[in-house]
């Protein structure tokens, strides 16, 4: 299984006990959804390696305390710290029609209320305080905050996102 077929679930941030348990910092708004998993994919040397879970439960809200099969010692767990954890895309919970996962809208056309089609979403930048649509049009990049005030409608059937941008924002990029 490749990373493109998976979604990022979190990162192993610490060992927990001398029995090989680890703490996984979950990158989700609903960590309780992931307490009953049978296995996860852990990134090692650019490969995704399946690990079966013996037991897991939430620890301090967004941390998942997990015991993997074949990880028996503190030293084994130490080797896993910093590794990214993934699950197959098929395990993503279904969302209501008006909600979306970031990966679902890559390639969608963005239609602005004033300017019409302003390009395609090439990426989502979520490394800032406010996630941004990264849109490309004619070799130029446009950044639009992913804000409920700006997003009018996400149309998954027609692969479009309708936005109402503040005056001057699109002109800033397109001139």
Curated annotation (Swiss-Prot):
Keyword terms: Chaperone, Cytoplasm, Ribosome biogenesis, rRNA processing
Q: What HAMAP family does the annotation carry? A: Ribosome_mat_RimM (MF_00014)
> Which species does the entry assign this protein to?
Christiangramia forsetii (strain DSM 17595 / CGMCC 1.15422 / KT0803)
Question: What gene is this protein translated from?
Answer: rimM
Question: What Pfam families does the record tag this protein with?
Answer: PRC_RimM, RimM
Primary site of residence: cytoplasm
> Where in or outside the cell is it found?
Cytoplasm
Annotated GO biological processes are: ribosomal small subunit biogenesis; rRNA processing
Q: Does the keyword Nucleotide-binding apply?
A: no
Name of the protein described by the UniProt record? Ribosome maturation factor RimM
Q: What is this protein for, i.e. what is its function?
A: An accessory protein needed during the final step in the assembly of 30S ribosomal subunit, possibly for assembly of the head region. Essential for efficient processing of 16S rRNA. May be needed both before and after RbfA during the maturation of 16S rRNA. It has affinity for free ribosomal 30S subunits but not for 70S ribosomes.
- In the UniProt record, which is one GO cellular component term? cytoplasm
UniProt free text on domains: The PRC barrel domain binds ribosomal protein uS19.
């Amino acid at each position: 299984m490749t990373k493109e077929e998976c979604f990022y679930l979190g990162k192993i941030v610490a060992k927990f006990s001398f029995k090989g348990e680890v703490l996984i910092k979950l990158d989700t708004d609903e960590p309780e959804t992931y307490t009953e998993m049978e296995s996860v994919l852990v990134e090692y040397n650019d490969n995704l390696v399946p690990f079966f879970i013996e037991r897991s439960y939430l620890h301090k809200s967004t941390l998942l305390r997990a015991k993997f099969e074949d990880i028996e010692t503190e030293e084994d767990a130490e080797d896993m710290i910093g590794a990214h954890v993934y699950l197959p895309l098929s395990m993503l919970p279904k969302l209501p029609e008006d909600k979306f996962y970031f990966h679902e809208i890559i390639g969608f056309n963005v239609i602005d209320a004033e300017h019409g089609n302003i390009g395609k979403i090439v990426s989502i930048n979520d490394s800032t305080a406010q996630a941004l649509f990264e849109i490309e049009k004619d070799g130029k990049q446009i950044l639009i905050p992913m804000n409920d005030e700006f997003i009018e409608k996400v149309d998954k059937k027609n692969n479009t996102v309708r936005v109402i941008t503040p005056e001057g924002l699109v002109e800033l990029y397109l001139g």
